Amino acid sequence: MNSLEMEGLKLELTEKSSKVILMWKGKSRHMNPAMILDPYFSEILDILANKEFTMDFSQLVTMNSSTVPPILSFIKELEEKRINTEIKYDSSLGWQSASFIPISTITRDYKYVKVLPI
């Protein structure tokens, strides 16, 4: 599985035994990121069976509102497939808190997906 780059955004995927980490870096400003992210997320789902997964947004500089729907869809799929997932964000960055507190509210009753400030 490869990392992904698009218009200033880099998603770095690393896999170590039973742990997979997807690190978000840079700026997500694509006008239709779902066109690129949805197929990429589908590929990631294929390798996550019986593994722990972390999506780390702490190094993301900015994210436009168009990026949120594909992330939410992916989170829902992770929960449905029972993939133990941690979503981490930098709570010292106001825009990240503003984006991820609502996501943590949406996922509060999820059993497999947890949103964690760092």
Task: Put a short name on every predicted segment.
Residues 1-61, 73-118:
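STAS-like cytosolic regulatory interaction modules
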Residues 64:
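Short conserved active-site loop signatures built around small residues
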